[in-house]
């Protein structure tokens, strides 16, 4: 297993739709292992392949943060097939360190995805899991959470990022 560096905004790989996963093999399993290790190292609960510079429709999630291996989720070529309700909570992102903003998301979602063997399955998520599904699938579509907030807030966030870049803190 290898810890891979997290790509930061404005890297182009974060802003374009990822390519579908077509090969389900040991290389994919190794990538998933690397993604979990990289996510844990960065203290995250979710990580999409574009966040480590790989344009593939693949994401990993672990709300237990290593406490319960049964809660590790791998979503390959995921899509949201049902949304219900509304929640407005603060989000952060490993590709946008130190940036946190409130984002409107569906309260409940159903995701359809493939597992490591290429088999399709459906999974429901509520509250934080629903938010994680939506946040990570957005990454696969080239959308960062700062593009789900108001233009005014986004402008303030982008100014803050530019200031950190000029100061060498980004």
UniProtKB/Swiss-Prot annotation:
Its EC number is 3.5.1.88. The keyword Protein biosynthesis applies. CDD domains: Pep_deformylase. Pfam families: Pep_deformylase. One of its GO terms (molecular function) is peptide deformylase activity. GO terms for biological process: co-translational protein modification; translation. Keywords: Hydrolase, Iron, Metal-binding, Protein biosynthesis. It catalyses: N-terminal N-formyl-L-methionyl-[peptide] + H2O = N-terminal L-methionyl-[peptide] + formate. Binds 1 Fe(2+) ion. The keyword rRNA processing does not apply. Its cofactor is Fe(2+). Fe cation binds at residues 93, 135, 139. The active site is at 136. Removes the formyl group from the N-terminal Met of newly synthesized proteins. Requires at least a dipeptide for an efficient rate of reaction. N-terminal L-methionine is a prerequisite for activity but the enzyme has broad specificity at other positions. Belongs to the polypeptide deformylase family. HAMAP family: Pep_deformylase. This is Peptide deformylase. It comes from Acidobacterium capsulatum (strain ATCC 51196 / DSM 11244 / BCRC 80197 / JCM 7670 / NBRC 15755 / NCIMB 13165 / 161). The lineage of its organism: Bacteria, Pseudomonadati, Acidobacteriota, Terriglobia, Terriglobales.
